[in-house]
Amino acid sequence: MARCRMPRWGLLLVLWGSCTFGLPADTGAFRRIFLKKMPSIRESLKERGVDVAGLGAEWNQFTKRLSSGNSTSPVVLTNYLDTQYYGEIGIGTPPQTFKVVFDTGSANLWVPSTRCSPLYTACEIHCLYDSSESSSYMENGTTFTIRYGSGKVKGFLSQDMVTVGGITVTQTFGEVTELPLIPFMLAKFDGVLGMGFPAQAVGGVTPVFDHILSQGVLKEEVFSVYYSRNSHLLGGEVVLGGSDPQYYQGNFHYVSISKTGSWQIKMKGVSVRSATLVCEEGCMVVVDTGASYISGPTSSLRLLMDTLGAQELSTNEYVVNCNQVPTLPDISFHLGGRAYTLTSKDYVLQDPYGNEDLCTLALHGLDVPPPTGPVWVLGASFIRKFYTEFDRHNNRIGFALAR
């Protein structure tokens, strides 16, 4: 087995685990990537006593600056401060291992590079891609920048063999040379593997999943995502080529995507106690596997939070007294003619580092101006309840009640 280039702070690898790559077993009809659930960056900051209110304000200011963007600096709505799930992939020959977030909100693959500047301390505690250790590396050199709500990454493009779920493709990916300290210093993942559409990719790069589809090795042109609600067991799983019945019950209900080249669908309202409170005239929603929370326009969230009796603790972060949780009402999201209902157990976070008297809600305000927004985001808090299938062949998203 090959290893990724060890960070220069070798001792810190104890905290982040080994960089040794092992391929998952070929399960026949499906190809699987097992996911591990981790504390989010926000949780890690809270554990260390860091006031995260300022980070929320920074995210809010970022969304206010959003515009149509351009091909060299695309806008990605995912806020990795709250991302909790990652899986392993291999890059190079022999493969170097990286822990990545599988993110339907973006379309590029990037990992930190050995060419990362020593000034960027966040690189020091992650596995670094070393092109000199790979016999299949091909130089590209095109520079790129990707802006996220929680920072931006810069680097250059390279080409190498990438192995995902036992499938190997020739892939152009990003070697990141500028990785911001906040938030990536405390990230348990090394990089991001975008599962979005080609239109979302920086630099005209063909996404990993499209290269996999071109090989014709999958039974269906779909992938599905399961996030476990039990943190003591398997964190989750990405299934390439289909959906696994052991993770859901009943049948899938499908909703066609509403925007070509994006995992975006229409929502017909958000209701509490059978009353539609917001999005009465319909609104757009992105199903984002890289996001943890459910986000929506600030004005809509505040109305929803007032109904729940929640208070705004910091910028767009809401809490309730923990003794209120059992009496909080259900929240329903109306998609494709059906109501997808979350109970308080689904939308209240278990925060072992926070105030024992206050419980954080997995709902955030997110103001995105036109033409990108306004938009809602359904992240892991929703996907944990509803097993989700992303169907590229039919341009639709399917939901089924998770087991």
From Swiss-Prot:
GO-annotated biological processes: angiotensin maturation
Enzyme nomenclature, EC number: 3.4.23.15
CDD domains given in the database record: renin_like
Proregion span(s): 23-65
GO cellular component: extracellular space; membrane
Gene3D superfamilies attached to this UniProt entry: Acid Proteases
GO molecular function: aspartic-type endopeptidase activity
Primary enzyme class: hydrolase
SUPFAM superfamilies from the UniProt entry: Acid proteases (SSF50630)
Glycosylation sites: 70, 140
Stored Pfam families: A1_Propeptide (PF07966), Asp (PF00026)
Domain of life: Eukaryota
Subunit field text: Interacts with ATP6AP2.
Family designation: Belongs to the peptidase A1 family.
Name of this protein: Renin
Gene: REN
